[in-house]
């Protein structure tokens, strides 16, 4: 995958994540700057999605740890580089843990 496609994919993904949070009832702050999406929950915890262009990976930092995701062309999903778990499942779990609400991330 070339760098331009990688950035397009991450831009689209970050917009989907922002939209899912905007549609939720959670009290949180979203900041997207320099390719890094930061979600600040009411309790002060954060969920951070950052692009790692040289590796063509998306990194997620959550209260439960750090996770690296690769884009799977066959499924059109970002998958954990070890367990192959889809990004949406991790975001759902982290949001429930940190924000106390079950937020769906369709298509992720």
Curated annotation (Swiss-Prot):
Pfam families, A to Z: Frataxin_Cyay
Superkingdom of origin: Bacteria
Keywords: Iron, Metal-binding
GO cellular component, one term: cytosol
GO MF annotations in UniProt: ferric iron binding; ferrous iron binding
The keyword Metal-binding belongs to this UniProt entry's keyword annotation: yes
Single GO BP term: iron-sulfur cluster assembly
Stretch forming the signal peptide: none
Database matches in InterPro entries: CyaY (IPR047584), Frataxin/CyaY (IPR002908), Frataxin/CyaY_sf (IPR036524), Frataxin_CS (IPR020895)
Function per UniProt: Involved in iron-sulfur (Fe-S) cluster assembly. May act as a regulator of Fe-S biogenesis.
Family indicated by similarity: Belongs to the frataxin family.
Protein name: Iron-sulfur cluster assembly protein CyaY
Species in which this protein is naturally found: Pseudomonas aeruginosa (strain ATCC 15692 / DSM 22644 / CIP 104116 / JCM 14847 / LMG 12228 / 1C / PRS 101 / PAO1)
Gene: cyaY
């Amino acid at each position: 995958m070339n760098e331009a496609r990688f950035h397009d994919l991450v831009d689209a993904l970050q917009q989907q994540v922002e939209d899912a949070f905007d549609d939720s009832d959670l009290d949180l702050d979203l900041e997207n700057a320099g390719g890094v999406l930061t979600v600040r929950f009411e309790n002060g915890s954060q969920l951070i999605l950052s692009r790692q262009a040289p590796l063509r990976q998306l990194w997620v930092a959550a209260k439960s740890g750090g996770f690296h995701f690769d884009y799977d062309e066959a499924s059109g999903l970002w998958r954990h580089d070890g367990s192959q778990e889809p990004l949406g499942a991790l975001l759902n779990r982290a949001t429930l843990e940190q924000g106390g609400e079950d937020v769906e991330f369709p298509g992720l």
